[in-house]
Amino acid sequence: QNEFMSAIVAGKTLDSFIKPEYLFQILTCIEATIPFVRPSADGLSASDRLYQRLQETNSKFNLNLTEAELIETVNKSVRMANRDISGFAAPSEIFIENTWNLLPETNHALLALNSYTVYDYRVAIEKTERFLSSLNPEFIFRKFDGKPDEKTYRNLVERARHNLEVGTLYLGCKLFSIAFMEALSLRVGLNIPLSTMMGEANCHDF
């Protein structure tokens, strides 16, 4: 939804200022930031399918982009997409920190600092651990037309694989400890704030 809305806003905002073929390229880059797209049943990657759609759209709307321009557009979109998710290949401590900092963004109950419950906290960690466990490192980063080169691409994949393993283990340990804390909190009552059990936290202590 975020990428779709970004494309709509970009299209409406820039439509009067730039040529259709340039807007076409911008929207292509925005679409490429949709993450974790798996290959199709016939083995085509997300970038391969995007390239096919660009060819069809270019022909349908007479945008007159050359084959070389279409390929370069997809290559630009790949670079943008890979930068957008570069954190998956970051050093493990940075990956863990980034994952931790995103918890409130995807679990709005945690925005109510010092009032979210032990249950809220446990659910947030459980959802994130389940999400990381579901990711296939082979489908995180993109490539097209030999770019990035195979060595660079495999390095990104293996670093992502390592980070997913570390992140899943870390969150699994957190989940075990908070499940124990949740069991204790139920002896006190339902919907007990985490701060009641552990003390008040600052915004970086999720």
Language-model segments: residues:
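His-Asp-centered metal-binding catalytic motifs of divalent-metal-dependent phosphohydrolases/nucleases
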Residues: 1, 6, 27-36
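An active-site-proximal "capping" alpha-helix that borders the catalytic cofactor pocket
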Residues: 2-16
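Divalent metal-dependent phosphate-bond-processing catalytic cores, especially two-metal-ion Mg2+/Mn2+ enzymes
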Residues: 12-21, 31-206
